[in-house]
Amino acid sequence: GGIEIWAPAQYPYRDIAQLSKILALSPAQIHCHAHPIGGGFGGKDDMALQPLAAVAAWKLGKSVRLYLNREESFLYSTKRVPFTFHMKTAADREGHLLAHQVEAYGDVGPYTGISVAVFNYGVENACGAYYFPNISIHGEAIFTNNAHTGSFRGFGNNQLNWGLETQLDLIAEQLQMDRLTLREENL
């Protein structure tokens, strides 16, 4: 026997690999048809309903269809990874960035999925597009009992980029320098 899945999956082969572990089946026993409907933007990066449908179908021995209305979809789908972070940024009087220190913590929810990769990618890009001769970055992905988090548009960059861009605005204000000039000088 085997199982056949139709789902709006972004990576059907990864889904097959994960479902084979969940169901203790050979990957050859699982066929996944990915619907090419709509944009991804992270919502189809992790498996959502596939494990629930697969287990139900396998146990019941018949076809199962899971459908979420709009409200259920918002409740069930992954949420953006919340970051808590502290930044220290040094610049000289002319606006040259000298150092950037980041300590970041990401609430990746109760179990692994793509959320740890999302957090790691955000931390890896904590300096944005700017040149800092000295950097110190520390990040920890923390498992909690909060909502399941995952991939969203920006893939972890938005959270720390918001902090960095806000930091640069504060530096420009303190130096009485144009915000765009500060950024252009440090690309």
Over which residues does each language-model region extend?
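Structural alpha/beta core scaffold segments of enzyme domains
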Residues: 1-187
